[in-house]
From Swiss-Prot:
Annotated Mg(2+) binding sites: E220, D244
Organism: Mycobacterium intracellulare
Statement: the UniProt record of this protein carries the keyword Metal-binding: yes
Oligomer status and interactors: Homotetramer.
EC number: 2.7.1.40
Listed Pfam families: PK (PF00224), PK_C (PF02887)
Positions annotated to bind substrate: R33, G243, D244, T276
Residues binding ATP: N35, F36, S37, H38, R74, K155
Lineage of the species this protein comes from: Bacteria, Bacillati, Actinomycetota, Actinomycetes, Mycobacteriales
Cofactor names: Mg(2+); K(+)
Chain positions recorded as K(+) binding sites: N35, S37, D67
Keyword Transcription regulation: no
Pathway: Carbohydrate degradation; glycolysis; pyruvate from D-glyceraldehyde 3-phosphate: step 5/5
Protein name in UniProt: Pyruvate kinase
Length: 472
């Protein structure tokens, strides 16, 4: 494995065939994102199955992420299709169900007329169009267009500063989550997280279905930034979703929030994704801007586990080129250094201390790899956050753990039989690494595991081993 940083690709109309999904995997996709804000269940099921087939065909671990819409507020539909709101026009956004016209359109947020006040801003399509509330008349919020632009069906609305009372999980989200879990997705992302308690609502649905998978908190609201530390602790991973975040917060604050979120996630051994507009110009062009290349590189330098493509791979003209370009940028950064900003965290847990010790032993002895046996992936994540230049190989008996670790920095995961003894683990390391062809007898590796084997949370062992030697 040469590239350590991971790539998340959003699937959509631009990648909706067996051949295109296979090409995405071959180009470097590590995690496939199913965006439940768009498409229907048939689309998502077909995409999921294509990813699984492509993963098996290539032998590459590819995770599947279900991204829930969350309490996203949207415009309704326009009867005559897309329109253009010009500066100075008056338009009405209504909570009543209606067929939209140029100057009156519905919204999915049925409490807008209650929550809005004169002077509030209403931002459409990630802030491309800006309205100001002039008044309320019954079900209608009357607005003046202050920054005009094109609008079309189902465009998102942001209400910065407004106290939105929507629940963390809508009825649609509950249905989508149930479907995604039954489908077999590996990861779930929750949109518009505001507090650590939001994850409990997701867990309640998961427990009813009878299947828990890691939950990713998407940072998109000012409340999430205010509660960042407790959200990082409560959730399994973090996504810095800069589109809505950049609408809800002053634009100049977003890079600082990104750096703070990445660092805090790493301090707590939680994987972190940086998302939105990373190579946005490649939706239409075969090459990114230099600024976009720098954006991807800086996310890698900050220590992000993964960077994400959205419209570039879902609706863009050059999805494969976007993945290959992102991969080249990541590799160029890593060819210079795999280091990330130093952690201030002082490990206090057994697994935390062991991960630091294993890294130090491996680097000082010039080992060829760190090998971690894992039941849940936790020990591997603790090793990954240290950004060691040594290859990080995870061995697990659980296919779902292999797919979940596809999002974790620098990790290459292998399915092995359930181990029952330390000697069995070491023999399995020899067998797997020699079969891989990148290692030879006599190579030094550092093994991290738990004794007795097979117990979640039992990591307590570091073993320095030369491949092929009977040193149990």
């Amino acid at each position: 494995m040469s590239r350590r940083g991971k790539i998340v690709c959003t699937l959509g109309p631009a990648t909706n065939s067996d051949e295109l999904i296979l090409a995405l995997v071959e180009a470097g996709m590590d995690v496939a994102r199913l965006n439940f804000s768009h498409g229907d269940y048939a689309d998502h099921k077909a995409a999921y199955e294509r990813v699984r087939v492509a993963s098996d065909a290539t032998g590459r671990a590819v995770g599947v992420l279900a991204d829930l819409q969350g309490p996203k507020i949207r415009l309704g539909r326009f009867a005559t299709g897309p329109t253009y709101w010009a500066d100075g026009e008056t338009v009405r956004i209504t909570v009543a169900d209606c067929e939209g016209s140029h100057d009156r359109v519905s919204t999915t947020y049925k409490k807008l007329a209650e929550d809005a006040a004169v002077g509030d801003r209403v931002l459409v399509d990630d802030g491309k169009v800006c309205l100001v509330v002039d008044g309320i008349e019954g079900d209608d919020v009357i607005c003046t267009v202050v920054e005009g632009g094109p609008v079309s069906n189902n465009k998102g609305i942001s209400l910065p500063g407004m106290n939105v009372s929507a629940p963390a999980l809508s009825e649609k989200d509950i249905e989508d989550l149930t479907f995604a879990l039954d489908l077999g997705v590996d990861l779930v992302a929750l949109s518009f997280v505001r507090s650590p308690a939001d994850v409990e609502l997701v867990h309640e649905v998961m427990d009813r279905v009878g299947r828990r998978v890691p939950v990713i908190a998407k940072l998109e609201k000012p409340e999430a930034v205010d509660n960042l530390e407790t959200i990082v602790l409560a959730f399994d991973a973090i996504m810095v979703a800069r589109g809505d975040l950049g609408v809800e917060l002053p634009l100049e604050e977003v890079p600082l929030v990104q750096k703070r979120a990445i660092q805090m996630a790493r301090e707590n051994a939680k994987p972190v994704i940086v998302a939105t507009q990373m190579l946005d110009s490649m939706i239409e062009n075969s090459r990114p801007t230099r600024a976009e290349a720098s954006d991807v590189a800086n996310a890698v330098l900050d220590g992000a586990d993964a960077v994400m493509l959205s419209g570039e791979t879902s609706v863009g003209k050059y999805p494969m080129a976007a993945v290959r370009t992102m991969s080249r940028i990541i590799c160029a950064v890593e060819d210079n250094s795999t280091a990330a900003p130093p952690l201030t965290h002082v490990p206090r847990t057994k697994r935390g201390v062991i991960s630091y010790a294993a890294r130090d032993i491996g680097e000082r002895l010039d080992a060829k790899a760190l090998v971690a046996f894992t039941q849940s992936g936790d020990t591997v994540k603790r090793l990954a956050r240290l950004h060691t230049p040594l290859p990080l190989l995870a061995f697990t008996a659980w296919p779902e753990v292999r797919s979940q670790l596809a999002m974790t920095w620098g990790t290459e995961t292998f399915i092995v039989p359930m181990m029952t003894s330390t000697g069995g683990m070491i023999r399995q390391v020899d067998k797997s690494l020699l079969e891989l062809g990148r290692y030879k007898r006599g190579d030094l590796v550092v093994i991290v595991a738990g004794a007795p084997p097979g117990t979640v949370g039992s990591t307590n062992l570091i073993h320095v081993h030369r491949i092929g030697e009977d040193d149990v």
